[in-house]
């Protein structure tokens, strides 16, 4: 990479803590090299309490844009010039673009990526009924983007734990910002309500840890609910 760095090379980066494990620098720098872009991507370890100082430093350096990971995804919003509609509703950013005049705009691409992947597989969310399992950050992003893209109904199911209040907050925000989408939240422990919702939905989303090790053999839904059509 050093052989292509010049005085004109544009810097992009990731901030958060920890970032040593991130594959983003390798991925972006490989892409820059393959496409011939005069750019470089680095990762900076920025703890939560240094979020503001980190953002100001990046503005001073004139970076072309940056990504944000935990624990700065929520805090960074306060130090940006504007937020995309999705980022504003989600309350967190993972990407910041920089305009020619230096203005910073925060985006959340988690939900966009989910909806775009569905589209690429011939599935549209507009007018559809979604059941979303989970109420964490990924679930929130998916719900918000689906609502903004015209989903008719979103039923969130989450265990009655510390994330349940987050799900309630998401429902309240969607009711105000996207009144055309009917959003609700129900305890995951209500198996009868879950079975009924899944039976009537068009798209079922698992945004929980179930399915990943060590929960890779667990399931939140009895397989008898599904039908092969």
State the predicted function of each range.
Residues 66, 130, 204-205:
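Receiver (REC) domain switch-region micro-motif
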Residues 149-179:
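NAD(P)-binding Rossmann-fold cofactor-contacting core
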Residues 36-44, 154-155, 181-184:
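Short beta-strand elements in bilobed, periplasmic/extracellular small-molecule ligand-binding domains
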Residues 4-121:
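Phosphate/diphosphate ligand-binding glycine-rich loop within oxidoreductases
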Residues 16, 108-111, 127-151, 158, ...:
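Glycine-rich adenosine-cofactor-binding loop
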Residues 5-6, 125-126, 148, 220-229:
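Short, conserved loop/helix-junction motifs that constitute active-site signature segments
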Residues 180-229:
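Rossmann-like adenosine-cofactor binding region
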